[in-house]
A protein has these predicted regions:
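Active-site microenvironment for binding and transforming phosphate-containing groups
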Residues: 1-333
Length: 333
């Protein structure tokens, strides 16, 4: 038997193989097999999705993106997600841990900038629904108070946080300046975007004809109900205010399914609740950009409603305040 085993290259107690070597009684492979076993346990990093402006994407000197809620490590808002998934909460909310937000911001920077991330600084705002526009001149500043920020410094990623409000990004192609705006209804009423363009003229000599603008996802006119007092405020400021508002009747599922049951009680089509007043913040900010002198062809609108799409976006209104924050960012290389 020994001669037979020897003739095929084996002896008692051993077995040879081109892919590795095992000794009798050993249960763990060595060499390449050990490496393969380790690779099978690696968990892939969740994908981080962004919305992008087709216009800004054509400018190689600019980095920009509108974050969504996917690809982070936050689990407090959706604990039912698979263990390998989490929300990309980028705001320091009272619900989330600071370490999670910092990890999410690092992931966002790496996903957007790749190897360049180490050379960039993220600059954010302490937002308060004001018309305050800040100019970043200090290369060391990373946190400012206001609701808009602009700079012509390279490698500064300007960020505004939203969870229904409207983010607006601007790029002056001639002077290499960028700006980011947080525009809720109060900021929009105060013309924060229009003010910002005026500040760019003063600071950088910007000609509005050289500006490319992008309006990101936010609560749409389909979902943004407001009170009559908001309509009165807008009518006092904008001649086109009537075009920004619409009356929306709430649907009644039972009435819609069985209309004959209600015909004797109430005329068809008449809602007992009455219409809700809805505001179009996308259009309100687009009109301000036009009034500031920016060409309609140089304004892009993502046009996605955050309140309708909570699987992709955070929505303060739909999720009743218990939600995270997206970040819209822009910078020049």
């Amino acid at each position: 038997m020994d001669d037979l085993l020897a003739s095929i290259g084996l002896t008692h107690g051993t077995r040879s193989s081109r892919k590795g070597t095992w000794t009798e009684g050993a249960r763990k492979p060595v060499g390449k097999k050990k490496k393969l076993a380790a690779e099978t346990t690696k968990v892939p990093t969740p994908k981080i999705d962004f919305d992008f402006s087709s216009l800004l994407a054509k400018a190689p000197a600019v980095v920009h993106g509108f974050s969504t809620r996917s690809g982070g490590v936050t689990r407090v808002y959706r604990p039912g997600l698979p263990k390998s998934q989490g929300d990309l909460n980028l705001g320091f909310t009272s619900h989330d841990e600071r370490k999670n937000v910092e990890a999410n911001r690092t992931r966002m920077m790496q996903a957007l900038l790749g190897k360049e991330a180490k050379d960039w600084k993220l600059v954010t705002l302490q937002q308060r629904h004001t018309p305050v526009v800040r100019v970043l001149r200090d290369t060391e500043a990373t946190h400012l108070r206001g609701d808009a920020v602009m700079t012509d410094l390279p490698h500064r990623l300007l960020g505004v946080m939203t969870a229904d409000c409207i983010p607006v990004l601007l790029y002056d192609r001639k002077n290499g300046a960028v700006a980011a705006f947080h525009a809720g209804w109060r900021g929009t009423l105060a013309r924060i975007v229009e003010r910002g363009v005026g500040t760019m003229k003063i600071e950088y000599g910007t000609d509005p004809k050289d500006i490319v603008a992008a309006i990101g996802a936010g609560i749409g006119p389909c979902c943004y109900s407001v009170g009559e007092e908001v309509r009165h405020e807008f009518e006092s400021q904008f001649a086109y205010a009537p075009e920004l508002f619409s009356d929306v009747y709430e649907s009644e599922p039972i009435r819609d399914k069985y209309p004959l049951l209600f015909m004797t009680a109430r005329a068809p089509g008449h809602s007992p609740i009455g219409p809700q007043l809805h505001l179009d913040l996308w259009e309100a900010n687009r009109r301000q950009l036009l009034d500031a002198g920016i060409s309609a062809k140089k304004i892009s609108v993502v046009g996605t409603c955050t309140a309708c799409g909570t699987s992709r976006y955070f929505s303060h209104r739909t999720e009743e305040g218990f939600t995270g924050r997206m970040m819209s960012v822009i910078g020049v290389r």
